[in-house]
From Swiss-Prot:
Gene behind this protein: sod1
SUPFAM superfamilies in UniProt: Cu,Zn superoxide dismutase-like
Keywords, ordered alphabetically: Antioxidant, Copper, Cytoplasm, Disulfide bond, Lipoprotein, Metal-binding, Nucleus, Oxidoreductase, Palmitate, Zinc
Cellular compartments annotated: Cytoplasm; Nucleus
Keyword Oxidoreductase part of the UniProt annotation: yes
Catalytic reaction list: 2 superoxide + 2 H(+) = H2O2 + O2
Protein name: Superoxide dismutase [Cu-Zn]
Cofactor binding summary note: Binds 1 copper ion per subunit.
Lipid-acceptor residues (S-palmitoyl cysteine): 6
Length: 151
């Protein structure tokens, strides 16, 4: 079993912790709690770089080693880092999801990359414009953190 953790922080009140775990070559379970969000859906992605020296903007674009367009987690064509949306109620998004494209090892490893929660709902690449195919029109980056291995 491989485990990883990400502590999310931003310039505002948004913060949280996300845990990742993977058994052998199986899917990755992603479980987290993010506080300080407005109610509703917020895009949640893995970005290419583990760099937050200039805030979350330093994390770069979505993790996309196969040069595909943005999509929903269940789509055949998507960025590896496209994990869809988390939904906040009373300011808190508590979620558990499973993804078969990200990994904690190998070519699709997310270790050392940033997880980012966005200000708006991810349109899952179905917004009908160029930005939708890049970012899902998810808007600004509210909080981010580097994903690291843990016990």
């Amino acid at each position: 079993m491989v485990r990883a953790v990400c502590v999310l922080a931003g310039s505002g009140d948004v913060k949280g912790v996300v845990h990742f775990q993977q058994q052998d070559e199986g899917p990755v379970t992603v479980e987290g709690k993010i506080y300080g969000l407005t109610d509703g859906k917020h895009g949640f992605h893995i970005h290419e770089f583990g760099d937050n020296t200039n805030g979350c903007i330093s994390a770069g674009p979505h993790f996309n080693p196969e040069s595909k367009t943005h999509g929903a987690p269940e789509d055949a064509v998507r960025h590896v880092g496209d994990l869809g949306n988390v939904t906040a109620k009373d300011g808190v998004a508590e979620f558990k999801l499973t993804d078969s494209l990200i990994s904690l090892k190998g070519n699709h490893s997310i270790i050392g990359r940033c997880a980012v929660v966005h200000e708006k709902e991810d349109d899952l690449g179905k917004g009908g414009n160029d930005e939708s195919l890049k970012t899902g029109n998810a808007g600004g980056r509210l909080a981010c953190g580097v994903i690291g291995l843990c016990q």
